[in-house]
A protein has these predicted regions:
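Active-site anion-handling motifs in enzyme catalytic cores
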Residues: 1-179
């Protein structure tokens, strides 16, 4: 990893809410390490389409603020909550740019590819659907029924069949079943 990083000119840390300590402290530390290592090895560092937070532990907040402030050359965020989290942590450099979540600006796959994926899961490619990608978090069990109600509403009001999309199967299937 470090050997490859040393041969790289631009390190892009991107997508998802990687900068958070809800799932674990270690994942936050790992991503902060990759950013620090990239900068130490001479790379330009960009955080692209990121979500920031929540970062609860005071030591993690200080560590994240220090690394981001010192090692990141450009940041684009996908939501205003992430911007507020950085401001609350005291991150003032680099300039933060609010942009669209990269997933909504990607071009769609060709229709035959989409149809094939749907059919491989037993889903009629000509139906009308609404997708839910749910991930459990502390307290999710108390909120899960809200997603189920939203799915019911979309079906009853608009005729959209809910499809639950497990992005990380080991976590997301359980969340979908709770909804």
């Amino acid at each position: 990893f470090l050997w490859r990083m040393g041969r790289t000119r631009l390190y892009i840390n991107g997508g998802g809410s990687l900068m958070q300590d809800v799932t674990s402290h270690r994942s936050l530390w790992f991503y902060l390490f990759t950013i620090s290592a990239a900068k130490a090895l001479g790379c330009q560092v960009m955080m692209y389409g990121c979500g920031i937070g929540p970062i609860h532990a005071p030591a993690n907040r200080r560590r994240a603020a220090k690394v981001l402030q010192k090692s990141v050359d450009a940041i684009t965020l996908r939501d205003t909550h992430s911007r507020a989290e950085l401001e609350d942590m005291g991150v003032t450099h680099p300039e933060v740019i609010l942009s669209a979540d990269p997933t909504v600006i990607l071009p769609a796959a060709p229709e035959p590819v989409i149809d094939g994926l749907l059919e491989s899961q037993g889903i009629d490619p000509h139906g009308r659907y609404i997708g839910f990608a749910l991930r459990p978090w502390p307290g999710f069990e108390q909120k899960a029924a809200v997603f189920g109600a939203a799915a019911d509403y979309a079906y009853e009001k608009y005729g959209l069949t809910p499809v639950f999309l497990p992005i990380e199967r080991r976590l997301d299937v359980g969340a979908a079943k709770l909804a």
